[in-house]
């Protein structure tokens, strides 16, 4: 039976740690850390994600600020909102909730965020810092994966790692973080020939393909650590009866892979909770540095 890499449990532990860091620095700083979220439009899923982030802020004693703009807002108004938050001394982290409505280009808007307040770690400067091994905000999902691997003392140095997916959001920074941990890293993508022959060599397999149930037992080396970044909602299956409603799944066919793997992240409850937690980590870290407080989160920003 594969070890369950429980992101929900680790996220709860890290929230307690962040709460303690905030409490320890509150008097000297004179204010709590603040996270500002810019939400555009009324996409229901985005609304749920934003609400979850605000609740997480509340649990650790972080202030949260929401700028909710209409779907047809001009790009200039979004830029003005971001610039205002860049100058706001209460704000340590800024998050532009994605995806954006049609007609808005996320590139210039993400670039407008102060790199020091880049809570998502997606600014070009911060991706460059990651590449060079310099300190700075880290991409949240890959950072969460690294924290999970570290929590379970999974060795990476000298291991063969394969990342499926090359997005700037997950795949590319994930590969850089694994490389920094001295793993030998390959990145697979939609043009990779004979994917299984590559993934069967992986001691650590990180799947961020964005395709439901894509990876099965034929892709996994016995004893491999498998990290499933994907999350998808499957429609209800009539053959399972009316009591079985829509289900969540990942990019991995977990029932097939679990008997082979030495460790596996569940979906839900694996990588997802850690993504939100790393957003908080980036924001608290900036607050500590900006307010001249002891920096107690260095181990989480690899």
Swiss-Prot record:
Q: Which Pfam families match?
A: THF_DHG_CYH (PF00763), THF_DHG_CYH_C (PF02882)
Which residues are noted in the entry as NADP(+)-binding?
165-167, 190, 231
| Molecular functions (GO terms) | methenyltetrahydrofolate cyclohydrolase activity; methylenetetrahydrofolate dehydrogenase (NADP+) activity
**Keyword terms:** Amino-acid biosynthesis, Histidine biosynthesis, Hydrolase, Methionine biosynthesis, Multifunctional enzyme, NADP, One-carbon metabolism, Oxidoreductase, Purine biosynthesis
The record's annotation in SUPFAM superfamilies points to: Aminoacid dehydrogenase-like, N-terminal domain, NAD(P)-binding Rossmann-fold domains
Presence of the UniProt keyword ATP-binding in the record: no
Write out the catalysed reaction: (6R)-5,10-methylene-5,6,7,8-tetrahydrofolate + NADP(+) = (6R)-5,10-methenyltetrahydrofolate + NADPH; (6R)-5,10-methenyltetrahydrofolate + H2O = (6R)-10-formyltetrahydrofolate + H(+)
| Xref: Gene3D superfamilies | Leucine Dehydrogenase, chain A, domain 1 (3.40.50.10860), NAD(P)-binding Rossmann-like Domain (3.40.50.720)
The annotated pathway is: One-carbon metabolism; tetrahydrofolate interconversion
Keyword Ribonucleoprotein listed? The answer is: no
- Gene Ontology biological-process entries: L-histidine biosynthetic process; methionine biosynthetic process; purine nucleotide biosynthetic process; tetrahydrofolate interconversion
EC assignment: the record states 1.5.1.5, 3.5.4.9
Give the GO cellular component terms, alphabetically.
cytosol
Q: At the top level of its lineage, which domain of life is listed?
A: Bacteria
Oligomer status and interactors: Homodimer.
As for family, the record states: Belongs to the tetrahydrofolate dehydrogenase/cyclohydrolase family.
Q: What does this protein's UniProt record list under function?
A: Catalyzes the oxidation of 5,10-methylenetetrahydrofolate to 5,10-methenyltetrahydrofolate and then the hydrolysis of 5,10-methenyltetrahydrofolate to 10-formyltetrahydrofolate.
Name listed for the protein in its UniProt record? Bifunctional protein FolD
- Whichever gene encodes this chain, its name is folD
């Amino acid at each position: 039976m594969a070890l369950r890499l429980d992101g929900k449990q680790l996220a709860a532990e890290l929230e307690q740690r962040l709460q303690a860091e905030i409490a320890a620095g509150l008097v000297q700083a004179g204010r709590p850390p603040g996270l500002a979220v810019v939400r555009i439009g009324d996409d229901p899923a985005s609304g749920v994600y934003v609400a979850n982030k605000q609740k997480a802020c509340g649990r650790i004693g972080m202030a949260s600020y929401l700028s909710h703009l209409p779907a047809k807002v001009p790009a200039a108004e979004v830029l003005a909102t971001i610039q205002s938050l860049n100058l706001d001394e209460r704000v340590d982290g800024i998050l532009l909730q994605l995806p954006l409505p049609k007609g808005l280009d996320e590139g210039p808007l993400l670039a407008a965020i102060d790199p020091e307040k880049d809570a998502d770690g997606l600014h070009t400067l911060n991706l460059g810092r990651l590449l060079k091994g310099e300190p700075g905000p880290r991409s949240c999902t890959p950072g969460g994966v690294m924290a999970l691997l570290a929590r379970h003392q999974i060795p990476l140095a000298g291991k063969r790692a394969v990342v499926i997916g090359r997005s700037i959001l997950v795949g590319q920074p994930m590969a850089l973080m694994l490389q920094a941990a001295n793993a030998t890293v390959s990145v697979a993508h939609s043009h990779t020939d004979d994917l299984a022959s590559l993934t069967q060599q992986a001691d650590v397999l990180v799947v961020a393909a964005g395709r439901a149930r894509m990876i099965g037992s034929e892709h996994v080396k016995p004893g491999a650590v498998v990290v499933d970044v994907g999350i998808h909602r499957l429609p209800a299956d009539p053959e399972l009866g009316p009591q079985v409603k829509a289900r969540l799944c990942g990019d991995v066919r977990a029932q097939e892979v679990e008997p082979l793997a030495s460790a596996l992240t569940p979906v839900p409850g694996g990588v997802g909770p850690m993504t939100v937690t790393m957003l908080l980590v980036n924001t608290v870290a900036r607050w500590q540095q900006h307010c001249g407080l002891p920096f107690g989160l260095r181990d989480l920003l690899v």
